[in-house]
């Protein structure tokens, strides 16, 4: 099975009203942990690489690890996605290396400049059958060393942006933020999910929810129990994510939850078995913790059982969509 494009994967999700998890990866164990979950549940999946991940692991290493997942699990639709590409050059590099989807994030620019940059990326990507996600509005928190304050996506701006750029998916700002500290407290959680359906109806394309880690209390407690310091971490309730999926969100970005699951498991090994020094003795439990974390999420997103619903279209075939 070839790599799946974001357009096809999210098009199916939008049609059948479920969400697909987009899980950030940095190394082999994360990819294996994610794949174990989606294989067990027969779910499509998006493996995405951020700028920080590419600096850490190198784009070629990560691409080859993701391709290994595709080779080992040919029955699972897999999209390899560049997360938060910030320049045309970085996006071109990912496309030329064989990524099936890219995000160009020019949301920190004024509207017209965001449109201009995004159109350049769309032209380059679509000529090669590659899907494009863009962002309008800004999320709070810190994403790869870039600090932002929240600016919610305006529905009419979203409609105009999609019409002008021709993007395949749009990341909308509805009050979530990057990182594990999304809100000051659980009582402070405020999300503008009411905007999602309006934007979905106006644009007619799949929407993306960034900053969607739930920061489960049991995982946070484990980290703190074994020497960590995350007392004030607060995430997005899974119920809010499910609500957003029902309104038009099709791609759900999750990063912090996987990191926390792996960190908690590794800390536990270090404290309970200080004699261990073989990386397999702690990376293995970390990998398993990711699987355990993601299984209930994937079920909640509704994508379980949908891996065999469609025949994946190759990038070469996908070029015809844009002619």
Curated annotation (Swiss-Prot):
Q: Name one GO molecular function term.
A: fructose-bisphosphate aldolase activity
Q: Give any single GO term for biological process.
A: glycolytic process
InterPro entries in UniProt: Aldolase_TIM (IPR013785), Class_II_FBP_aldolase (IPR050246), FBA_II (IPR000771), Fruc_bis_ald_class-2 (IPR011289)
Question: Which SUPFAM superfamilies does this chain map to?
Answer: Aldolase
* Gene null: resulting phenotype: RNAi-mediated knockdown is lethal.
Q: Does the keyword Lyase apply?
A: yes
Active site, per annotation: 83
On pH dependence, the entry says: Optimum pH is 7.5.
Describe its assembly. Answer: Homodimer.
Q: What does this protein do?
A: Plays a key role in glycolysis by catalyzing the cleavage of fructose 1,6-bisphosphate into dihydroxyacetone phosphate and glyceraldehyde 3-phosphate. Does not cleave D-tagatose-1,6-bisphosphate.
Please name the PANTHER family in this protein's record: D-TAGATOSE-1,6-BISPHOSPHATE ALDOLASE (PTHR30304), D-TAGATOSE-1,6-BISPHOSPHATE ALDOLASE SUBUNIT GATY-RELATED (PTHR30304:SF0)
Protein name, as recorded: Fructose-bisphosphate aldolase
Its organism's taxonomic lineage begins at: Eukaryota, Metamonada, Diplomonadida, Hexamitidae, Giardiinae
């Amino acid at each position: 099975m070839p790599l799946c494009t974001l357009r096809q994967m999210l098009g199916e999700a939008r049609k059948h009203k479920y969400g697909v998890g987009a899980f950030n990866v940095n190394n082999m164990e994360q990819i294996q942990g994610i794949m174990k979950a989606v294989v067990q549940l027969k779910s499509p999946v998006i493996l995405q690489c951020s700028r920080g991940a590419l600096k850490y692991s190198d784009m070629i290493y990560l691409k080859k690890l993701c391709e290994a997942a595709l080779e080992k699990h040919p029955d699972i639709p897999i999209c390899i996605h560049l997360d938060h590409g910030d320049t045309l050059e970085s996006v071109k590099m990912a496309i030329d290396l064989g990524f099936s989807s890219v995000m160009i994030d020019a949301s920190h620019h004024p509207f017209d400049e965001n449109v201009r940059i995004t159109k350049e990326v769309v032209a380059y990507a679509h000529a090669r059958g590659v899907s494009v996600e863009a962002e309008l509005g800004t999320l709070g928190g810190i994403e790869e060393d870039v600090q932002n304050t929240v600016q919610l996506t305006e529905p009419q701006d979203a409609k105009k942006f999609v019409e002008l750029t021709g993007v395949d998916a749009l990341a909308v700002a509805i009050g979530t933020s990057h990182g594990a500290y999304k809100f000051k407290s659980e009582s402070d959680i405020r999300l503008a999910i009411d905007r999602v359906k309006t934007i979905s109806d106006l644009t007619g394309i799949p929407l993306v929810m960034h900053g969607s880690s739930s920061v489960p209390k049991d995982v946070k407690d484990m980290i703190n129990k074994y020497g960590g310091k995350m007392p004030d971490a607060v995430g997005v309730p899974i119920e809010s994510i499910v609500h957003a999926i029902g309104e038009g969100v099709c791609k759900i970005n999750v990063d912090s939850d996987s990191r926390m699951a792996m960190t908690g498991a590794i800390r536990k090994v270090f404290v309970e078995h200080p004699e261990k020094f073989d990386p397999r003795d702690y990376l293995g439990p970390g990998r398993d913790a990711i699987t355990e974390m993601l299984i209930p999420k994937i079920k909640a997103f509704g994508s379980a059982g949908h891996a065999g619903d469609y025949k994946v279209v190759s990038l070469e075939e996908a070029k015809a969509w844009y002619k």
